[in-house]
């Protein structure tokens, strides 16, 4: 007699894949923290490059940081020299005068040493993350690689996110009877609190933290795509429920779609930003026809054919 639900226990290979993805996630978080620390250190020395270059850790940013740590004065001659050596790009966010002005800070020996340490740590983290990316790619089997390719078609999901999602939920969706069961397991279903027939708002249930956080990040990226289903969904929910709830709702929808894609082995097709408008139009037509029937009015088949659903 089955009184308890079955629990999925991944095999050793999949557990190792999860550990690789989980460790990569922690290193990515550490990398972001170190980059923020570097930015704060520069601002403390009255050097603000965030409005001058798009990526402080890019090629141009690294060349400018080398110059800052050296203690030399950055002037017109230094700018032209770096430009001639192709160490900085001609197409920076700020013009030449603004860049020279932003580089005129006052950096102490201690600050210079700390910047060197932070930059070394950033390089080490980037190297470790790159190594883990290769290990994860080599660890995936053919079925998991196909699943990653299917999931990547969804807006907001990158290679890294797709690999992490597959490492957690696997490729066999038969162990989740419905998409709602998967969302509940992932901690993306709202709490169900009802009293006296009135349903109250509740927090989302507990679930897999790594899966939930990954999907929330994907949702933030997905809603930025113009004229998309997720973008329109976010706008509609955020207008009356708030941004945070809207992001969780989008993450919930993404996980539902992932279940459908893996269950049916289908490619993703965006429903478009006009999906909700068409759906509302159809519902209004159906409601109107029912009201007419209640009044004893029945439309002829040729009249119904003229109604566009």
Task: List the predicted regions and their residue ranges.
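A detector of single, family-specific signature residues
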Residues: 1-309
């Amino acid at each position: 007699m089955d009184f308890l639900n079955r629990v999925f226990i991944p095999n050793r290979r999949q557990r190792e894949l999860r550990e690789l993805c989980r460790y990569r996630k922690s290193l990515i978080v550490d990398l972001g923290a170190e980059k923020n620390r570097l930015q704060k250190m520069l601002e403390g020395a009255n050097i603000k490059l965030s409005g001058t270059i798009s990526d402080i850790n890019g090629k141009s940013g690294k060349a400018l940081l080398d110059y800052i740590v050296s203690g030399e004065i950055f002037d017109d001659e230094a700018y032209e020299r770096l430009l001639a050596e192709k160490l900085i790009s001609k197409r920076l966010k700020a013009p030449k005068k603004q860049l020279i002005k932003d580089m005129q800070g006052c950096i102490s020996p201690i600050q210079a040493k700390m910047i060197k340490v932070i930059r070394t740590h950033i390089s080490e983290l980037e190297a470790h993350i790159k190594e883990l990316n290769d290990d994860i790619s080599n660890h995936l089997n053919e079925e998991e690689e196909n699943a990653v390719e299917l999931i990547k078609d969804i807006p907001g999901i990158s290679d890294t996110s797709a690999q992490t999602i597959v490492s957690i939920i696997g490729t066999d969706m038969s162990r989740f009877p419905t998409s709602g069961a998967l969302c509940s397991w992932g901690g993306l279903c709202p709490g169900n609190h009802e009293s006296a027939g009135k349903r109250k708002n509740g927090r989302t249930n507990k679930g897999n933290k790594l899966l939930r956080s990954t999907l929330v990040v994907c949702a933030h990226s997905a809603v930025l795509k113009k004229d998309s289903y997720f973008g329109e969904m976010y706008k509609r929910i955020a207008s009356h429920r708030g941004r945070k709830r809207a992001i969780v709702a989008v993450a919930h929808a993404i996980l539902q779609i992932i279940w459908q894609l893996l269950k049916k082995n289908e490619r993703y097709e965006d429903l478009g930003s006009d999906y909700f408008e068409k759906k509302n139009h159809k519902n209004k037509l159906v409601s109107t026809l029912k009201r007419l029937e209640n009044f004893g009015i029945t439309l002829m088949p040729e009249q119904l054919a003229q109604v566009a659903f």
